[in-house]
């Protein structure tokens, strides 16, 4: 890795979106992590018939395809499709030859060991990368916010985690996983809008609801008070124009949708809300570092983009924590991509260059080298 001008490729594979690029300040390519296969092979006349479509192309042809997400709850469940996504990332999106670059990948906290090895194997054996490294998403988010100690709440499309990090290392015994994230909020909003008499069922309509969720929803500081206000007047109502020109009006759904993050019982889940998960994570850590964790709670991922979420987290945690504790919740404006940005920062550090797993090391030790070098 002595060559200074070889650019590292940074790939953050999320359950919903794949973010990829070089050592810049923002990802070059962001596309849906989906693979589509023709429902009825042979009838797509005139189209260059492929056996699979990836990302935006799969999205645009979804009427005639069966769409699958190879990453469920942050963990890769279908390796053939995952390989297709990586192939698409390198050759179609970034237009690079992976054998000429080192590649930095991200993984969920508590990723199964076998998965980590499989990832490493595919990178070296299928794509012949120069070198590679795997890092935990939450740790990268923390780097992007400019610190190495803190508690990260990372919530994406498929899964949420609360991860305590001390001096750059995640503390695995205290990590909490919550299978509640963006996809569930979209599902819930679809259901809630049905109560208003609007019908959203197909995958295409689901994308519309996701857009409504991203543009119009917010987290209420006081949910009951907000419900009362919404019931008494129409000041909280907003209208949204559908692609067919119809306009729908949404009122209390605007804050009922993300409230599920704090009260999962709204959708029949028995788990704790994100504030409670964060509190439990901190309480599982050594008493001496709790002050540092409370003082730097960092939000990351697309599902933390709701306006008002930072203030609400501060309020909820202040109620749970000891009264003398100073609590600071950080919600960086670029948090949608902070995992990727952290990866980009890490890959361009001169001190990081000796950390890569090289092709030679892989050939000598096999896939298990990843546990020794990436922890």
From Swiss-Prot:
Pfam families: Actin (PF00022). It is found in: Cytoplasm, Cytoskeleton. The keyword Cytoplasm applies. GO terms for molecular function: ATP binding; hydrolase activity. SMART domains: ACTIN (SM00268). GO terms for cellular component: cytoplasm; cytoskeleton. Its EC number is 3.6.4.-. Keywords: ATP-binding, Cytoplasm, Cytoskeleton, Hydrolase, Nucleotide-binding. It catalyses: ATP + H2O = ADP + phosphate + H(+). The keyword Heme does not apply. It comes from the Eukaryota. Actins are highly conserved proteins that are involved in various types of cell motility and are ubiquitously expressed in all eukaryotic cells. Essential component of cell cytoskeleton; plays an important role in cytoplasmic streaming, cell shape determination, cell division, organelle movement and extension growth. Belongs to the actin family. This is Actin.
């Amino acid at each position: 890795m002595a060559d200074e001008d070889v650019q590292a490729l940074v790939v953050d594979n999320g359950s919903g979106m794949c973010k990829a690029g070089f050592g810049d300040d923002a990802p070059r390519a962001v596309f849906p992590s989906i693979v589509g296969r023709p429902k009825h092979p042979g009838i797509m006349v005139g189209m260059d018939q492929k056996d699979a479509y990836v990302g935006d192309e799969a999205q645009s042809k979804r009427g005639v395809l069966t769409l699958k997400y190879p990453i469920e709850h942050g963990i890769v469940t279908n390796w053939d499709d995952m390989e297709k996504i990586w192939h698409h990332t390198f050759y179609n999106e970034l237009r690079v030859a992976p054998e000429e670059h080192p590649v930095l990948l991200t993984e969920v906290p508590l990723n199964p060991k076998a998965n980590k090895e499989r990832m490493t194997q595919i990178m070296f054996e299928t794509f012949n990368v120069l070198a590679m490294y795997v890092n935990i998403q939450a740790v990268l988010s923390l780097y992007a916010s400019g610190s190495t100690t803190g508690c990260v709440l990372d919530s994406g499309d498929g899964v949420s985690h609360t991860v305590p990090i001390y001096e750059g290392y995640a503390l695995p015994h205290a990590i909490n996983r919550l299978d509640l994230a963006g996809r569930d909020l979209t599902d819930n909003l679809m259901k809630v809008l049905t109560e208003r008499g609007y019908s959203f069922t197909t995958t295409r309509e689901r994308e519309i609801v996701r857009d409504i969720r991203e543009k119009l929803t917010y987290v209420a500081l006081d949910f009951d008070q907000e419900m009362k206000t919404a019931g008494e007047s129409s000041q909280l109502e907003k209208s949204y124009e559908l692609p067919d020109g119809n306009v729908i009006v949404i009122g209390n759904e605007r804050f009922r949708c993300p409230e599920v993050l704090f009260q999962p019982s709204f959708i029949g889940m028995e788990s704790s809300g994100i504030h409670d998960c964060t509190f439990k994570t901190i309480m599982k850590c050594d008493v001496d570092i709790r002050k540092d964790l409370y003082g730097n709670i960092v939000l990351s991922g697309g599902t933390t983009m709701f306006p008002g979420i930072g203030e609400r987290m501060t309020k909820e945690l202040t109620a749970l924590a000891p009264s003398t504790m100073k609590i600071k919740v950080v919600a960086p404006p670029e948090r949608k991509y902070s995992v990727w940005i952290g990866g980009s920062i890490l890959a361009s550090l001169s001190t990081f260059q000796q950390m890569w797993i090289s092709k030679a090391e892989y050939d000598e030790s096999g896939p298990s080298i990843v546990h020794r070098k990436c922890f």
